[in-house]
Swiss-Prot record:
Belongs to the sterol desaturase family. SCS7 subfamily. It comes from Saccharomyces cerevisiae (strain ATCC 204508 / S288c). Ceramide hydroxylase involved in the hydroxylation of sphingolipid-associated very long chain fatty acids. The keyword Ion transport does not apply. The gene is SCS7. This is Ceramide very long chain fatty acid hydroxylase SCS7. Heme binds at residues 45, 72. Residues 1-197, 247-284, 329-384 are cytoplasmic. It holds the Pfam family Cyt-b5. Residues 217-221, 303-304 are lumenal. Its EC number is 1.14.18.6, 1.14.18.7. It comes from the Eukaryota. Disruption phenotype: Causes a lack of alpha-hydroxylated very long chain fatty acids in yeast sphingolipids. This confers resistance to syringomycin E, an antifungal cyclic lipodepsinonapeptide produced by Pseudomonas syringae.
Amino acid sequence: MSTNTSKTLELFSKKTVQEHNTANDCWVTYQNRKIYDVTRFLSEHPGGDESILDYAGKDITEIMKDSDVHEHSDSAYEILEDEYLIGYLATDEEAARLLTNKNHKVEVQLSADGTEFDSTTFVKELPAEEKLSIATDYSNDYKKHKFLDLNRPLLMQILRSDFKKDFYVDQIHRPRHYGKGSAPLFGNFLEPLTKTAWWVVPVAWLPVVVYHMGVALKNMNQLFACFLFCVGVFVWTLIEYGLHRFLFHFDDWLPESNIAFATHFLLHGCHHYLPMDKYRLVMPPTLFVILCAPFYKLVFALLPLYWAYAGFAGGLFGYVCYDECHFFLHHSKLPPFMRKLKKYHLEHHYKNYQLGFGVTSWFWDEVFGTYLGPDAPLSKMKYE
């Protein structure tokens, strides 16, 4: 098998590898060292998926050499290396290091040039997805960037800082990963109020959707009500784009004010600073009520009453789909037809935060000239 020395890969324990042993999550090792995630390859394997699943979570060195089972060409090894290599199996000594790390992850250096993956540097090509969840070295990050110390409550650091706007905007969009759950914002009894699980959004808002649509269906032509519902969903996609581009990313219009920085941080900056924090990803209901109220009043002021009920139900349903989609783009293995959208959104975080504002689609990005394509430039990094 060819040797790849140009990647910085992650280290995994044997126990971790053994846990990835199903058709939906299949890892194998080669030469008891290289780890491959072959889940996507199962359906494409010429010899069928059963021959691979028999070795899920195990080493495939001997079976790869066994021509009686299946002949493997050099290109088969190259495909494994280029497309499915995700990390290395820890030795006993390395495993001991893993067990002393609360996040059970240690990044190992495998490249010949001595470079390491740095999430705070925007990149042309996204790294392996597993890398996005490697914990930031808090101490080194603070020493290098002189920005926020992940060991201490973040909001008070911003309020007490002497950051200039350009420095704050530059640094807040450079991704970090806390690695121990959610980083502290307040560090006191208010902390639980800053966290929202993904399931809260449908539980809180789908009943409201059902109520408003139910009122519309009872009081107007049902086919027309469904049409207005669909219009509401479509209008939401434009609102989604507009809010993300002009409210969440009001970076250029930020005043030189710590209160403004703190507001920006709570509204959206925190998500860019810690994009893989699963409890700071969907919108807290309280914040959504504040943002939604003007739109609710506008819809009911402009449209006949029951038209407004149907249209608002569609818009609210569109929001629920958006927030759930946003969560799963960050935290799930998605079917093939969703992978381009996932890549597109992650590039908004790790490549260029000034493009790619659509989350559920890139339609409005194409309309308004903010499409984040393969040739798009990296966001500038002014402060190192």
